Amino acid sequence: MNFIEDLKWRGALNQITDEAGLLEAMASGKVGAYVGTDPTADSLHLGHLIPFMVLKRFQKAGGKAVIIIGGATGAIGDPRPTTERQLLSSEQLAENEKGITAQVTKLFGDNDTRIVNNNDWLGQLTLTDFLRDYGKLFSINVMLKKDVVASRLETGISFTEFTYQVLQGIDFHELWRREDVKLQIGGSDQWGNITSGIDLIHSLEGNEAKAFGLTIPLMTDSTGKKFGKSEGNAIWLDPKKTSPYTFYQFWLNQGDADVVKYLKYFTFLGSEEIDDLAEAVATNPGERLAQRRLAQEVTKFVHGESAVKEAEDLSTALFSGNVATLSAAQIADAFGGVPSFEAANTVKNIVDFLVDGGVEASKRQAREDVANGAISINGEKVTDVAAEINPLSHYDGQFVLVRRGKKKYFLGKIK
C-alpha cells in the first residue's frame, strides 16, 4: 500500500486536495510535509498525537517531516468554534514552547525531522508588509465562509483570531519556500486554513506550484464521545502530567468495540498482524491480546521501551497483590484515584486506624473484617485486632495502603 492507501485502510483520511498530484510528487522525489502545533499548554495531549502519527507515517513512506512550533501563532490563538481564547503571556508561551519542543523531539528523534518556530518569520513581519504582501491576497468574502469563522459570526470574533488563517497560510508558504514542504497535515477543523495556505502559495508562486493538504477525521469512540480523555481528564504526553503507567492503562482499558480502530490509527503494525488481533478480539475477547498490544505499542512510541516494562511490572504487582516492594512513586501513580484519607505519622491500633481513616464505618465492623482476614496493610494481611500500624514503615513514610476485601483500596497519606 502507498501512503494514501494506508491512511484510507486505517480510517485516518478525511479530506485531501489532490490525491493523484500528491502521490506523483512523492514518487518524483523526496518532498516535505508538516504539522503545526501552538504552545497553548506546556504539554501535548492525545488529540495532538493524531496528526503526528500521520506525519510519522509520511516519514516512513520516504517523506521529510517538518514540525512547526507556533511561537507567533500561539500568541494569537487559533479560533475555536465557540469562544475567544485567553491570550497567554510571553513568559508562559516560552515555557510551553520549551516543553512541547522536547516532546516532539522525543517522538521523532533525529531521523531527518526538522523542528522550526514560526516566530522566525512571522516575528519579523511588519504590519505594513503583512497588509501589503499578504492581506491583498485574501478575500474577506472567502474568509467569512470558513467553518470556524462562520460559527463565530453571531457570538463575535476578534480581528486577531480572524487573521489567524492568514498567518497559517504564511507558514505553509514559508515552509514551501524554505523546506520544500508540499503537504500540510491537520485535523478536520483545519481544512479551511489549509486550503487558504494552498491558495496563497498559488497566488505567490503560480497555479502550477505543487501544494497539497489533507485532514484527519475527528476521532471518537464507539459511543460517539470525543477521544482522548479518561474520566473527563486529558491524557497528556508529559510523564509528569500523565504517568506512563496511567497512559498504558488508558490504552489497556479500551473496549472491544474500539481497540481495532485504535490499533490501525495509533500503531505502525501492519494489516496482517492487526487482522490477527481483530480475530483474537472476536474469538477470545477475555484474553485482551489486542488491548495489551495497543498499550505496548503506543506507550513505547511516546515514552520508550523501558516505560512499557515498568508499566507491565507494576500491573503484575497490583494484580498479584504484591505491593510491598513498590516505591512511593509507584504507589502514588497506581493508587492516585482510589479513596484517600489523611493519617498521622504516629503508631496506632489497626481498628482505630481503619475507623479514623473512613475505611470502616465502626469499630465493630473493623474488628470483624480484621479477624476474618479481609484487611491487608501495605500488601500484608492483618488478622490480629491488637496489631499496631506504623505509618512510617513503608513507601518512604508517605503512604499506608489499605485493601479491604479483594479489590477495594484506600490510600492513607501521611501528614
Curated annotation (Swiss-Prot):
Pfam annotation, one family: tRNA-synt_1b
UniProt xrefs under Gene3D superfamilies: HUPs, RNA-binding S4 domain, Tyrosyl-Transfer RNA Synthetase
Residues that, per the record, bind ATP: 229
SUPFAM superfamilies the record matches: Alpha-L RNA-binding motif, Nucleotidylyl transferase
Gene Ontology molecular functions: ATP binding; RNA binding; tyrosine-tRNA ligase activity
Subcellular location: Cytoplasm
Motif 'HIGH' region mapped to chain: 39-48
The reaction(s) this protein catalyses: tRNA(Tyr) + L-tyrosine + ATP = L-tyrosyl-tRNA(Tyr) + AMP + diphosphate + H(+)
Claim: Membrane is one of the keywords in the record: no
Domain S4 RNA-binding: 348-415
Family: Belongs to the class-I aminoacyl-tRNA synthetase family. TyrS type 1 subfamily.
Entries under NCBIfam families matching the protein: tyrS
Entry function: Catalyzes the attachment of tyrosine to tRNA(Tyr) in a two-step reaction: tyrosine is first activated by ATP to form Tyr-AMP and then transferred to the acceptor end of tRNA(Tyr).
Subunit structure: Homodimer.
Protein name: Tyrosine--tRNA ligase
